[in-house]
């Protein structure tokens, strides 16, 4: 009911706030026998970690994960896996001036109206800091899917503002702080971020995720369609405002003769559907795009109200990302992995004997 859990067989429950003592999660449903250590989770956590680039937030957190349960002699036991990450570099005093104000574009207003109380320090539970535990849980799913089924899940920055970044190379994605696959776009991205920092503003971004070697049959129509669950998971990420699957919204300009993925004995000729038909994976790569809004915490003064419903001006202090898309790549990968892991285990439970 409280919306802190995702999944039916592979279940992930997260807890913690941006400026609380720690972040944590419980992962239930991991099959036994998977070799797993903190090192397996730390790689993706380091990719998401704040303070690793001059282009992201200056908050510096080691994000070192500890495994509390579910592992014995280096392998999963099939019981619940408990993970925890302690917060270190939180500066709650940065938010003391706005504790009675509602930051426009944030969850301050809606949390206050819904619960009658909110943690104003860094956004509390609504902060993107919460996604660290999703990345840790997603790393477990990614490892299992890859080792047992050869499934790979990778993402890259495909647009920042009006800078389009077409795919060029997966190797290049990990060679720059933007997760951009096109080296020719790096200078333009750098200049844009520098300019935004100078004027105290922010920009939106688009992330593309591609999952390969997906077996046919994942997804449960009607209400648990694979594309519906993937959209739900991706839209649950902070600042996500839109999801496209396959050709997405460009289908409105296509004709049926163009969009349909014709089939031959060798397989599908095209992949306009993004690897999902009728809510079920068709064996082609799953292609997704997520649009992220500009960061709402900026230095530019803006209009808002306080708790007394009085009109005021607000300038948000603190340490914030000029573009949340820069750290969204491992988060989107994690959410796709969690959904695919859950659906694969559900498929195995229902259809393994056919």
From Swiss-Prot:
Belongs to the chorismate synthase family. FMN binds at residues 125-127, 238-239, 278, 293-297, 319. The keyword Aminoacyl-tRNA synthetase does not apply. The keyword Amino-acid biosynthesis applies. Reduced FMN (FMNH(2)). GO terms for cellular component: cytosol. GO terms for biological process: amino acid biosynthetic process; aromatic amino acid family biosynthetic process; chorismate biosynthetic process. Pfam families: Chorismate_synt. InterPro entries: Chorismate_synth, Chorismate_synth_AroC_sf, Chorismate_synthase_CS. This is Chorismate synthase. It comes from Buchnera aphidicola subsp. Acyrthosiphon pisum (strain APS). Its EC number is 4.2.3.5. Coiled coil: none annotated. Homotetramer.
